[in-house]
From Swiss-Prot:
Main location: membrane
Gene field: M6PR
Organism encoding this protein: Bos taurus (Bovine)
Lumenal topological domain: 29-187
Record-linked Pfam families: Man-6-P_recep (PF02157)
Keywords: Disulfide bond, Glycoprotein, Lysosome, Membrane, Phosphoprotein, Receptor, Signal, Transmembrane, Transmembrane helix, Transport
Lineage, highest ranks first: Eukaryota, Metazoa, Chordata, Craniata, Vertebrata
Name listed for the protein in its UniProt record: Cation-dependent mannose-6-phosphate receptor
Domain MRH: 32-183
Length: 279
């Protein structure tokens, strides 16, 4: 007959085994993400901010095919996610279309990232080693993400492969994304600033004058409007000013003729009409 102590020991061991399996499964199902180059916990704040900026692209996959058979290759790229089929941390892979061979160009567990005003450079290191080039160093992928405010992410294309050097070889890719754009800063023009200032002054004048007329002077009705008499006569003042500026001759222009007074008329002789009378 099995002792209670032995049975309890077996139960505890079984529970520990089940717990270990559960932890391992959770680790396997947890999706990996970018690991910046450098000591853990001492990553650059700027690099971490840039990776967070690219978060909307984490669930997207980008593919581009180049060449012609039998030298046709397909490149698959993902941001901080597995792009290959072997869970090797590959962020960018090259697939030979003729035989299906997959080559890891760069892994996201060795990531570098930096940016400029309208671009972001994402670098994956730690790819598969070259066979006969670049001193057999590991491959490296450089993805240039340029600003395009009209798309979240598009136009992923390989540009070139630099492998004519002894070291520091790389694959260069490009793509467009609005995430690489700097925030738009709206600037007010000089005219807009003047209009805002003028509107503010007018509002202060009307409100302040209204309160003064009502509370201090004790005005009622239309008389509460500041300088009411001036504004009522403004039309006449403008008309007078326009007349003064625009008229082309003086107001009191001397007449081109003068009237003749009665004293200047001589007495006409009536004799010159006598012959017209009937005889």
């Amino acid at each position: 007959m099995m002792s209670p102590l032995h049975s309890s020991w077996r139960t505890g061991l079984l529970l520990l085994l089940l717990f270990s399996v559960a932890v391992r499964e959770s680790w396997q199902t947890e999706e990996k993400t970018c690991d910046l180059v450098g000591e853990k916990g001492k990553e650059s704040e700027k690099e971490l901010a840039l990776l967070k900026r690219l978060t909307p692209l984490f669930n997207k996959s980008f593919e581009s095919t180049v060449g012609q058979s039998p030298d046709m290759y397909s490149y698959v790229f993902r941001v901080c996610r597995e792009a290959g089929n072997h869970s090797s941390g590959a962020g960018l892979v090259q697939i030979n279309k003729s035989n299906g061979k997959e080559t890891v160009v760069g892994r996201f567990n060795e990531t570098q990232i930096f940016n400029g005003s309208n671009w972001i450079m994402l670098i994956y290191k730690g790819g598969d080693e070259y066979d006969n080039h670049c001193g057999r160093e590991q491959r490296r992928a450089v993805v240039m993400i340029s600003c395009n405010r009209h798309t979240l992410a598009d136009n992923f294309n390989p540009v070139s492969e630099e492998r004519g050097k002894v070291q520091d070889c790389f694959y260069l890719f490009e793509m467009d994304s609005s995430l690489a754009c700097s925030p738009e800063i709206s600037h007010l023009s000089v005219g807009s600033i003047l209009l805002v200032t003028l509107a503010s002054l007018v509002a202060v004048y009307i409100i302040g004058g209204f309160l003064y007329q009502r509370l201090v002077v004790g005005a009622k009705g239309m008389e509460q409007f500041p300088h009411l008499a001036f504004w009522q006569d403004l039309g006449n003042l403008v008309a007078d000013g326009c007349d003064f500026v625009c008229r082309s001759k003086p107001r009191n222009v001397p007449a081109a003729y003068r009237g003749v007074g009665d004293d200047q008329l001589g007495e006409e002789s009536e004799e010159r009409d006598d012959h017209l009378l009937p005889m």
